């Protein structure tokens, strides 16, 4: 992580990495995502699926495991340095979904993975020896373009350090009404307009949501990958059922396993060129 990236992430609570995926990587991931999204429910492999009646967003379960072109994104070389710094070389892949957002979907209301009154709880964001550490964060791999005015991901910059709970109706009053359309970006809110092949990194502490998707001829598709640290449990103990695990390669299996604090995973030892798996 460069000093500029570290400062921006600490200041705002997110990073927008541009043109992370190569042309070939993006094309393969787009093709795989399209197969999953357009697949009839009766053809879904075991443990795959989605709540097609959800009003604000469709999330296809275990998206990264659907195809190898999506699976390799979980440890893409361009994001690896960020995984290493945020987890202090102790990464655990603990969740994911393939997101699909179309015209007609409702506003995805603001939310976060923590509450200020619970600080630090089990989800922590802190600085250690000049490095950013975060025990729970997400990466958004964009498979389609988002332009200003389209809608999509919104966040409250700096909210990862908030000391007060957000008033529920602040920024988007009336959001709980059934016919509510949220398509504005009021002061204090940022709309992330990423292009296909970009990646957005965001601690789960950050308050975020999604504007109503406006284009009728285009949708928003993205792979969400969630990481925490290997020695802490902030979600399910076993988030991936056997039918999903059987599809994964050994490196991914190692990434999803819990691990002792004082031992580095094999993939970390190999990629970081460490002499020993013993962690200090």
What does each of the following model-derived ranges do?
Residues 22-23, 98-101, 105, 145-148, ...:
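Short, solvent-exposed loop/turn segments at secondary-structure junctions
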Residues 43, 169-171, 199-201, 205-280:
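Non-heme Fe(II)/2-oxoglutarate
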Residues 96-98, 139-141, 223-227:
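A structural signal for short, well-ordered beta-strand segments
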Residues 105-112, 119-122, 149-158, 164-168, ...:
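A short secondary-structure junction signal
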Residues 132-136, 146-207:
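Double-stranded beta-helix
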């Amino acid at each position: 992580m460069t000093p500029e990236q570290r400062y921006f992430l600490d200041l705002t609570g997110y990073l927008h990495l541009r043109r992370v995926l190569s042309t070939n990587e993006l094309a393969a991931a787009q093709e795989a995502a399209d197969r999953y999204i357009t697949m009839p429910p009766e053809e879904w492999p075991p443990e795959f699926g989605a709540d097609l009646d959800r009003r604000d967003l469709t999330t296809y379960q275990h998206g990264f495991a659907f195809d190898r072109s999506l699976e390799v994104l979980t440890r893409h070389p361009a994001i690896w340095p960020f995984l290493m710094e945020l987890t202090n070389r102790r990464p655990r892949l603990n969740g994911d979904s393939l997101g699909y957002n179309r015209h007609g979907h409702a506003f995805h209301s603001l939310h976060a993975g923590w509450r200020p009154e619970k600080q630090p709880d089990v989800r922590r964001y802190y600085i250690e020896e000049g490095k950013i550490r975060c025990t729970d964060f997400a990466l958004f791999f964009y498979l389609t373009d988002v332009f200003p005015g389209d809608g999509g991901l919104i966040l409250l910059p700096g909210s990862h350090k908030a000391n007060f709970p957000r008033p529920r109706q602040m920024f988007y009053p009336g959001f709980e009404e059934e016919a509510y359309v949220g398509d504005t970006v009021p002061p204090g809110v940022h709309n992330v307009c990423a292009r296909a092949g970009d990646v957005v990194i965001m601690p789960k502490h950050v308050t975020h949501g999604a504007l109503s998707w406006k284009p009728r001829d285009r949708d928003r598709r993205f792979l969400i990958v969630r990481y925490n640290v290997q020695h802490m449990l902030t979600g399910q103990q076993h988030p991936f059922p056997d039918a999903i695990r059987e599809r994964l390669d050994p490196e991914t299996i190692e990434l999803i396993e819990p691990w002792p604090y004082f031992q580095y995973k094999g993939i970390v030892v190999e990629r970081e060129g460490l002499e020993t798996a013993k962690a200090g």
